[in-house]
Swiss-Prot record:
It comes from the Bacteria. The beta subunit is responsible for the synthesis of L-tryptophan from indole and L-serine. Belongs to the TrpB family. Its cofactor is pyridoxal 5'-phosphate. Tetramer of two alpha and two beta chains. This is Tryptophan synthase beta chain. The gene is trpB. It catalyses: (1S,2R)-1-C-(indol-3-yl)glycerol 3-phosphate + L-serine = D-glyceraldehyde 3-phosphate + L-tryptophan + H2O. GO terms for molecular function: tryptophan synthase activity. HAMAP family: Trp_synth_beta. GO terms for cellular component: cytoplasm. The keyword Lyase applies. Pathway: Amino-acid biosynthesis; L-tryptophan biosynthesis; L-tryptophan from chorismate: step 5/5.
Length: 405
């Protein structure tokens, strides 16, 4: 935890892309130029009213924003304690928060004259969102995806192909999200002249952590205004799942300077942190460099990245966005591990009480919100980011429960 309290969280990152001791730009010399070009283009675009207007128009008419806040009354009664509210990002076009970011980056790619976009994906939602905006803007799209994730997310793989994208299986390493990101980086280095890399989470070298955060920050801005309009006050606590952490930082950002709002991130504890089969980078990791930024990573005593595990492909990543590492160290946010079993139980409870199938990623946040609600009085408000819908996970859940579909 930082020695001195931080009065303004919006002062970060600094000009070099650092969130305290985290973040930065640790990349090969060949990527310095492209990253500088991207940073300059983004800083120019975000100050351009016409770019902002185009982005806002797409969020409204294409994505379907604003997404509502739903009071999960039956779930709240079943759990006891505080009232659980759901920010319904699962209702967005493509079924998750990911399109908030891909729309912004794809518009930036077109503005920069790029004709080819590449992306990495774990659960497949970012791949689907990237393929979707590529089709809309007439851009070529390649999506790198770990072979392990392809097996557990066949529906999203086919969705990407239906949208015209090429899906490249990655078999190196653990054949999951980190390996897909590695391969996408290699592609970008080779084809930087005509290619734009749409990173799906708040990781990577600067400017990606702040750019992806900014494009997802609509979630928190909406939620803050909706809470004040519908409930006359801010929530007592907010919760979101954290792998890389894009949906979480999207919700958290609008509340960072509100000390009365407690912030919680749900990491993937897998089979339990003590077993070593997890993906809880903050709870069980240590500072290191991964994919171009300094953050908390899961590694061995020699600093080598180790394999992770989560039932959720989107959380199965051995690092976390540098802003989350910073928020944890500063004490502003608390990150807790949620096991596979806890996420599964939350998935079923939400389905049975509210008729909502949450993504396995989002189910980690639902499980955390249930725990928080049980510790708070009945009039307290817990806002949970329901970052995606669970259609993509039906086969995974059935297989875990011994059912063949």
């Amino acid at each position: 935890m930082s020695a001195q309290p931080i009065s303004d969280f919006y002062a970060y990152p600094d000009a070099a892309g650092h969130f305290g001791k985290f973040g930065g730009r640790f990349v090969a010399e060949t990527l310095i130029g492209p990253l500088q070009e991207l940073s300059a283009a983004y800083d120019q675009a975000r100050q351009d009213p016409s770019f902002i207007a185009e982005y806002d128009k797409d969020l409204k008419h294409y994505v379907g924003r604003p997404s509502p806040i739903y009071h999960a009354e039956r779930l709240s009664r079943e759990v006891g304690g505080a009232q659980i509210l759901l920010k319904r990002e699962d209702l967005n076009h493509t079924g998750a928060h990911k399109i908030n970011n891909t729309i912004g980056q794809a518009l930036l790619a077109s503005r920069m004259g790029k004709t080819r976009i590449i992306a990495e994906t774990g659960a497949g939602q970012h791949g689907v969102a990237s393929a979707t905006v590529a089709a809309r803007l007439g851009l070529e799209c390649l999506v790198y995806m770990g072979a392990t994730d392809i097996e557990r997310q066949k529906i999203n793989v086919y969705r990407m192909k239906l949208l015209g994208a090429t899906v490249i299986p990655v078999t190196s390493g653990s054949a999951t999200l980190k390996d897909a990101l590695n391969e996408a980086m290699r592609d970008w280095v080779t084809n930087v002249r005509d290619t734009f890399y749409i990173i799906g989470t708040v990781a990577g070298p600067d400017p990606y952590p702040r750019m992806v955060r900014d494009f997802n920050a609509i979630v928190g801005r909406e939620a803050r205004a909706q809470m004040l309009e519908d409930y006359g006050r801010l929530p007592d606590a907010i919760s979101a799942c954290v792998g890389g952490g894009s949906n979480a930082i999207g919700l958290f950002h609008a509340f960072l300077n509100d000390p009365g709002v407690k912030i919680y991130g749900a990491e993937a504890a897998g089979d339990g942190i003590a077993t070593g089969r997890h993906a809880a980078s903050i709870a069980a990791g240590r500072p290191g460099v991964l994919h171009g930024n300094r953050t908390y990573v899961i590694c061995d005593d020699d600093g080598q990245i180790t394999e992770t595990h989560s039932i959720s492909a989107g959380l199965d990543y051995p690092g976390v966005g540098p802003e989350h590492a910073f928020l944890s160290d500063s004490g502003r946010a608390v990150y807790q591990g949620i096991t596979d079993d806890e996420a599964m139980a939350a998935f079923h409870l939400l389905a049975h009480t509210e008729g909502i199938l949450a993504a396995l990623e989002s189910s980690h946040a639902v499980a955390q919100s249930i725990k928080l609600a049980r510790e708070l009085p009945k009039d307290a408000l817990v806002l949970c980011n329901l970052s995606g819908r669970g259609d993509k996970d039906v086969h995974t859940i059935a297989a875990r429960e011994g059912l063949a579909l």
